[in-house]
């Protein structure tokens, strides 16, 4: 039994242009999904065939075309190329337009997106990036009260700042974490927690979920009230060869964490990724042509305590994936709830 099970789709902004990406969000609702999230990259991980439409513009377009989907970023970095006060204003506006449907997923950032837009000096170490993230979240929440805010932090400041159009209760903030330090912060301070699949189950069962629980307990919060989201990388197709080949576009995901966080040029990123063999690329994915096998490979994430499954399909024919998902996988997954 999985309490609060939700199924969503990752709209791959690195793979599809603005119009196709909007239609993908609309199709997600038509296929019965509960949420759709989008990445927020200034540059894609691929130079050839890559895309990078603006997440906030996409969210408003999808919001106008849908009625019930939860919409959000997975994830945005509100700390370098953005001023967090402006991010707070943008999401407050969307929260007024689409009440109860908008969330802000945030992370510590990647050089690929920030250096191209003018960041000077050495790319900061994790300690500074994490400190910036915590400070930006605090500032945004202060602004979502609707009060005048004089904020003087180490990295950001406001003077008599007010956001005049704010939904009641502000905007839910989901914290993305790849390790226990940020996961504890998510448990302490996030309405939601975000992680990604394919890294070995011990990471989730021994590190991430226990850290979220620890953070929640220290803040006297109920762990069950935190939406535990995981992006599940799945290449499902009734044709096994297609299921394997579809992963190739997303070879950059199989680069090391250091490469992904430090390479600042899509051309360099693409060259490094394309040097990887398809077998290594596919290791990060659930690759299957059998629905029962696919669900059996997804179920450990539910057993680990994650309740909000957002599926990232790598193929270019996203309608085919959604059709197959609605027919073969969604009923089996919802039967677990």
Swiss-Prot record:
Q: What protein name applies here?
A: F420-dependent glucose-6-phosphate dehydrogenase
Q: What positions does UniProt annotate as the active site of this protein?
A: 41, 110
InterPro entries linked to this entry: F420-dep_G6P_DH (IPR019944), F420-G6PD/mer (IPR050564), F420_G6P_DH-rel (IPR019945), Luciferase-like_dom (IPR011251), Luciferase-like_sf (IPR036661)
Q: Which positions does UniProt annotate for coenzyme F420-(gamma-Glu)n binding?
A: 40, 77, 108-109, 113, 178-179, 181-182
Give the species: Rhodococcus hoagii (strain 103S) (Rhodococcus equi)
Q: Which gene encodes it?
A: fgd
List, alphabetically, the PANTHER family matched: 5,10-METHYLENETETRAHYDROMETHANOPTERIN REDUCTASE, PTHR43244
Q: How does it assemble?
A: Homodimer.
Where on this chain does substrate bind?
196, 199, 260, 284
Query: What is this enzyme's catalytic activity, as reactions?
Result: oxidized coenzyme F420-(gamma-L-Glu)(n) + D-glucose 6-phosphate + H(+) = 6-phospho-D-glucono-1,5-lactone + reduced coenzyme F420-(gamma-L-Glu)(n)
| Family (UniProt) | Belongs to the F420-dependent glucose-6-phosphate dehydrogenase family.
GO molecular function per UniProt = coenzyme F420 binding; glucose-6-phosphate dehydrogenase (coenzyme F420) activity; oxidoreductase activity, acting on paired donors, with incorporation or reduction of molecular oxygen
Q: Taxonomically, what lineage is the organism?
A: Bacteria, Bacillati, Actinomycetota, Actinomycetes, Mycobacteriales
Record keywords: Carbohydrate metabolism, Oxidoreductase
